[in-house]
């Protein structure tokens, strides 16, 4: 099975990562030396296709004149993410985040901040589509992502294995900035925009935190809130690793 990557940056990041890119199509009127050089080095065939053809191939995702065909996204297991962590693991789990832009932005932040991986549900949630890859600026191609059938069961299993499960909820009493470093490792759980954490998912959390807000606005976009919380979590885990 294959998937489509749309846009210069996502295609470049795919070639820089471990993604198997099969073909690259570009507009004949434009040149892409960085993509051409990388494709030639990896033996990836390139061909021209007009804008209408690229629009159809990308299924409406903005492509900047570059579309690639790659092998299906390779998910991993949560246990694999933990096993490859160099220090106390830091992961983010997403509870029914359905908006591709939010998912892509969260993946980009997680990769940039050095989190070990992400966990997303198989159902009632956005998948790793061309729109998500583009929204992540290609960060999906560098991320370790597990896709699970039952998020609640996965969180329970991770908690039993020793990780601390930290939920993010605007109504919580504890400020995320007040978390202490955890030598066990942590999983940050972020809910969907509007709905937040589902009740059963919230019950699986060992602790629930909020982001302190001082201004006149009373809410944050889901991806922005996730980025702030991930920064705090990653900083705490870095401190725990250094202390160890």
Regions found by a protein language model. Give the residues of each.
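N-terminal positively charged helical leader segments and presequences
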Residues: 1-83, 244
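RNA substrate-binding interface of SAM-dependent RNA methyltransferases
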Residues: 12, 16, 20, 30-31, ...
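Short, acidic/turn-prone active-site loops that include or flank metal/cofactor-
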Residues: 29, 51-53, 123-125, 193-195, ...
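Short acidic-hydrophobic, aromatic-tinged amphipathic segments that line or gate anion-handling sites
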Residues: 46-50, 144-152, 209
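Short, hinge-like loop/turn segments at secondary-structure boundaries
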Residues: 64-67, 134-139, 182-186
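Short amphipathic alpha-helix with an adjacent loop that forms part of the alpha/beta core around
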Residues: 79-85, 157-159, 177-182
């Amino acid at each position: 099975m294959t998937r489509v990557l749309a846009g210069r940056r996502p295609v470049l990041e795919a070639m820089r990562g471990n993604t198997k890119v099969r073909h690259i199509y570009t507009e004949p009127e434009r040149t892409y030396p960085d993509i051409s050089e990388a494709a030639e080095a990896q033996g990836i065939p390139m061909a021209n296709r007009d804008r209408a053809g690229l629009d159809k191939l990308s299924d409406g995702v903005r492509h900047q004149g570059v579309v690639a065909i790659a092998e299906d996204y390779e998910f991993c297991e949560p246990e694999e993410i933990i096993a490859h962590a160099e220090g106390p693991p830091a992961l983010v789990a997403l509870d029914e985040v359905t908006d591709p832009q939010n998912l892509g932005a969260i993946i980009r932040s997680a990769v940039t901040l050095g989190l070990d991986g992400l966990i997303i549900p198989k159902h009632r949630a956005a998948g790793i589509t061309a729109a998500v890859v583009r929204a992540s600026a290609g960060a999906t191609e560098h991320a370790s992502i597990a896709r699970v059938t039952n998020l609640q069961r996965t969180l329970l299993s991770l908690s039993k294995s020793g990780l601390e499960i930290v939920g993010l909820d605007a109504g919580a009493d504890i400020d995320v900035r007040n978390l202490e470093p955890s030598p066990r490792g942590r999983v940050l759980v972020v809910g969907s925009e509007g709905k937040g954490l589902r009740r059963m998912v919230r019950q699986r959390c060992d602790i629930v935190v909020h982001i302190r807000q001082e201004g006149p606005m009373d809410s944050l976009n889901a991806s922005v809130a996730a980025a702030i919380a991930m920064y705090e979590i990653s900083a705490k885990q870095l401190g725990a690793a250094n202390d160890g």
